[in-house]
Amino acid sequence: NVLIDDVIGTALFTLLPCDPADLASCDFTHAAFAGEDLRVLIGQITTAGDLTGQLQVQVFVEGDADQEFRGIIPFTPYAPELLVDGCIDPAACNYDGEATADDGSCVYCGAECAGGSDYSMTVELHVEDVVAGQTTYRFYQNMINPDDFLSSVYGNEDAPFVFETTTGFYNSQFGGSVASAINPAFLSFFPDLAADSWVTIGIESQNVGDEVAISTCL
């Protein structure tokens, strides 16, 4: 399990690929931009157990570093048949205590929710039995705009970064804690590398071309 709840904290980050004063110069194909599918890959976990946790994200809304969203994004055990759509923010007027998956319907003091719960996380089943008896899940940060930029994923004393399973994670000896440590050339020799558990911002293996390796700050 992973728990980051100290005063200093830990951040996973990538740099904005353009001049902040000239957004027209941005490379919007960069993996940290939401793109047309409005989401950014943030992790892969392989386990035989159930998943729970939360993390905090920093998003530059429409690529503008002066207009950022920061929020704690929780996720519940992966069990699609048990998900109940609704407003899961207790601060909202229409909070639904029975809901387990936010559907963007939260209303605050008569006004439509314009932030917060609109940024959410999706956990998807990626592949099964690369490692016998275990399931590989992928985590995606859901965005609002195609040019939203996921700048960092982090945890600290005020907003812990938590990934927990009931049985532990699978880690390949040839992998790493971040996706940029995964060398695709090794996959044919070590198939279990495809099931390695890691965190990321957008990329799923070693950075290539103009891609930037994922950085961490402790």
Regions found by a protein language model. Give the residues of each.
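Non-catalytic macromolecular-recognition regions in eukaryotic signaling proteins
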Residues: N1-V84, A111-L218
